[in-house]
């Protein structure tokens, strides 16, 4: 039997057990390692036991070190359980309290005394002077330490800046390759790490470096040949082979599978996350609808993409603040107030404020086409608002508050939460301070009574910040809002998730912040996106987002009803139908690169065939079904070396790549990369379903396969949550 012992946390209680029995000392081979924190006992090809307590119990029972049938041994068994399950400090207290006898049970040292000593020694806690130190265990500990010291450094997983081998299995292998390649080539370790990529074909290897990426002067193919010859294989990296200018590495598949399963099973919902940017704070401003205008497809894109970005920053250790910056100020609210006096209806306002205010807004704009003086009334009303007249503000407040209540309902349905509801109206004196600073810096110019910033030399046109009547514009309020946010939140990054049509506005804003020499000018970023085309109901009219979502729900509900047996098994089928519909909408929205326009295609969107939202939900629900129908519980200690089939290896390779994906999303923030990953994993899972059954398999194989399916479900579910989907258990 092989006992892998973590060098940095030697379990002396296990060494004490081994030292107490001659047969055990001869049978067990001690293997020092720095790769794990838990001892692992490999009994045979089918049985592996992980964890100090589990290994200790196995050794005690297998070698009859305690006669459990003997009544006098019951007290010994009780002490063994206490020692193996309680905290070392409690064991220390119990030892101190035991004063009737020299040792725990009598005046002669027994196995429980050796165990107790081992626990205390491992925890570096003192033991009573009268106790005999287990010298044989200390000698074994010294042998382990000596063995680790003489073993090659390649057994140690290097900790490289910006990597997380404790949560990302691919970092384990990449760090080892990058470290040794740095010693061979002299190329910077980070450059080597970043150059490591998945090859197009696994026939050539598991990881590859395109030598030209390293920017080394000379012949890339020749370098690849020379470096491959010098590379020393080890337990983790089995070979390095040069193919043209590429250096291909083959990693130990058994270790990859084992480490992947260990991490996915251990971290669960947190699998894939890292803490590399812990302590940093980001504001993500997204959705930001205009009150009195429809919550339409453009807002849907900003909402879905913004929530995704917030999730990505969360997963990479940032503290995030999701902010909804409502369009709740400006001349249009003067127009809305004038319109409400003419066309408003209190009941309709209470029932659905967003729709009713939009109807009022459309009608008053129609009126204004026939009677241009309405615009003068609107401007006068908005001036009263800016001057703080209470009567004007009270009506505006009602519109705003009622609209926010309705928005929150829609966001809850989309599985989206905002930390802050802000708006143009909330900007305080930051706007006035910014205008004053613009004036003092000589940036502000007069233009026919208005105040402008001339940005033409930056190819950003002229930007108006104050109209002739003294009222402000979007840009003015955005400058003031940015200043106030930095003063309040001291963010490390602020992201505006806004459509590409606003590119010029955001460039003008950022350039103005730069000209004002604000400390945070280099901490702002615009994440843009293309348009949704053809987003209308089956009746052909452009409508509110809720109508689109209701239609999606109705379509999916109709599909679900076609299978009466499965439909009757689903709890709350209407909610499930709604979630499948939302998944269809979100996945279609996120399937292409952000900047691309896309055609809203309901026939494709709600299909269970091909790469769609419903297909991903089905893959997750089917994984849940495998767990339910197996009749087994997940065994984290299952022998995954039994997973030798190509289908299983492929699934776990993809699972292993998920933490890398999460980290890489910080560059580009493209949700389509997660969608592609989710489809790839779903297809591989589907192939497994056909080939690798759990029910009917031998117990050890069933355990291993079920653990693999569990890790796949954890990973697929986490990818779905990143995209804002709620993984379904039945459908």
What is the meaning of each model-derived region?
Residues 157-257, 265-731:
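Non-catalytic interaction-recognition regions
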Residues 67, 100-107, 313, 662-668:
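Short helix-to-loop capping/linker segments positioned immediately adjacent to catalytic or ligand/cofactor-binding
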Residues 1-12, 17, 25-27, 145-179:
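Eukaryotic N-terminal low-complexity, Ser/Thr- and Lys/Arg-rich leader segments
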Residues 103-125, 132-144:
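GST superfamily/GST-like fold recognition
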Residues 68-73, 101-112, 568-577:
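All-alpha amphipathic helical-bundle segments outside canonical DNA-binding/catalytic cores
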Residues 46, 103-105, 125-130, 393-397, ...:
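Active-site rim elements
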């Amino acid at each position: 039997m092989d006992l892998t012992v973590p060098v940095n946390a030697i379990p002396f209680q296990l060494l004490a057990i081994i030292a107490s029995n001659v047969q055990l000392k001869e049978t067990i081979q001690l293997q020092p390692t720095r790769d794990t924190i838990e001892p692992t006992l490999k009994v045979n090809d089918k049985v592996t036991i992980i964890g100090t307590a589990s290994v200790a119990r196995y050794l005690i029972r297998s070698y009859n070190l305690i006669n459990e049938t003997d009544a006098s041994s019951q007290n010994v068994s009780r002490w063994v359980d206490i020692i193996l399950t309680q905290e070392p400090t409690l064991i220390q207290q119990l030892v101190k309290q035991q004063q009737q006898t020299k040792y725990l049970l009598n005046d002669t040292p027994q196995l429980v005394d050796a165990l107790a000593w081992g626990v205390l020694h491992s925890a570096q806690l003192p033991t009573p002077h009268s106790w005999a130190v287990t010298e044989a265990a200390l000698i074994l500990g010294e042998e382990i330490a000596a063995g680790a010291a003489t073993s090659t450094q390649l057994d140690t997983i290097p900790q490289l800046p910006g990597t997380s081998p404790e949560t990302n299995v691919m970092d384990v292998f990449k760090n080892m390759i990058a470290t040794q390649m740095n010693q061979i080539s002299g190329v910077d370790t980070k450059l080597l790490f970043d150059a490591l990529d998945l090859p197009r074909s696994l026939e050539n290897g598991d990881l590859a470096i395109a030598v030209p990426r390293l920017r080394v002067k000379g012949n890339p193919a020749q370098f690849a040949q020379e470096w491959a010859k010098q590379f020393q294989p080890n337990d983790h990296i089995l070979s390095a082979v040069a193919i043209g200018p590429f250096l291909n590495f083959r990693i130990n598949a058994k270790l990859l599978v084992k480490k992947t399963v260990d991490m996915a099973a251990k971290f669960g919902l947190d699998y894939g996350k890292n803490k590399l940017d812990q302590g940093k704070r980001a504001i993500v401003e997204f959705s930001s609808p205009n009150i009195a205008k429809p919550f339409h497809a453009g807002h849907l894109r900003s909402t879905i993409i913004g929530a995704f970005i917030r999730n990505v920053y969360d997963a990479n250790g940032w503290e995030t603040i999701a902010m909804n910056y409502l369009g709740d100020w400006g001349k249009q609210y003067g127009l809305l107030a004038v319109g409400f006096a003419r066309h408003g209806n209190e009941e309709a306002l209470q029932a659905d404020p967003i729709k009713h205010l939009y109807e009022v807004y459309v009608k008053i704009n129609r009126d204004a086409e026939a009677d241009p003086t309405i615009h003068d009334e609107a401007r006068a009303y908005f001036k009263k608002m800016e001057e703080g007249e209470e009567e004007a503000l009270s009506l505006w407040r009602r519109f705003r508050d009622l609209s926010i209540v309705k928005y929150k309902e829609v966001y809850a349905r989309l599985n989206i939460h905002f930390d802050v509801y802000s708006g143009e109206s909330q900007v305080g004196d930051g706007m006035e301070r910014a205008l004053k600073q613009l004036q003092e810096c000589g940036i502000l110019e007069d233009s026919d009574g208005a105040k402008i910033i001339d940005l033409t030399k930056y190819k950003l046109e002229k930007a108006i910040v104050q109209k002739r009547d003294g009222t402000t514009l979007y840009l003015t309020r955005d400058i003031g809002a940015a200043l106030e946010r930095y003063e309040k939140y001291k963010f490390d990054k602020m992201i505006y998730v806004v459509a590409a049509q606003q590119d010029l506005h955001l460039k003008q804003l950022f350039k103005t912040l730069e000209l004002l020499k604000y400390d945070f000018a280099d901490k702002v970023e615009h994440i843009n996106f293309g348009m949704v085309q053809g987003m209308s109901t089956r009746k052909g009219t452009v409508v509110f987002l809720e109508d689109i979502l209701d239609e999606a729900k109705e379509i999916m509900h109709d599909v679900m009803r076609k299978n009466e047996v499965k439909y009757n098994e689903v709890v709350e089928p209407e909610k499930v139908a709604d979630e499948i519909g939302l998944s269809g909408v979100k996945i279609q929205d996120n399937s292409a690169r952000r900047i691309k326009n896309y055609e809203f295609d309901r026939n494709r969107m709600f299909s269970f065939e091909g790469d769609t939202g419903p297909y991903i939900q089905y893959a997750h629900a089917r994984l849940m079904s495998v767990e339910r129908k197996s009749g087994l519980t997940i065994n984290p200690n299952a022998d995954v070396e039994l997973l030798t089939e190509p289908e299983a290896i492929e699934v776990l390779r993809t699972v292993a790549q998920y933490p890398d994906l999460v980290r890489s999303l910080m560059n580009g923030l493209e949700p389509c990369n997660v969608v592609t990953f989710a489809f790839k994993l779903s297809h591989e899972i589907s192939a497994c379903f056909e080939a690798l059954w759990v029910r009917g398999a031998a117990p050890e194989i069933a355990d291993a396969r079920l653990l693999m399916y569990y890790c796949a479900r954890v990973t697929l579910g986490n990818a779905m949550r990143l995209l804002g989907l709620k993984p379904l258990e039945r459908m």
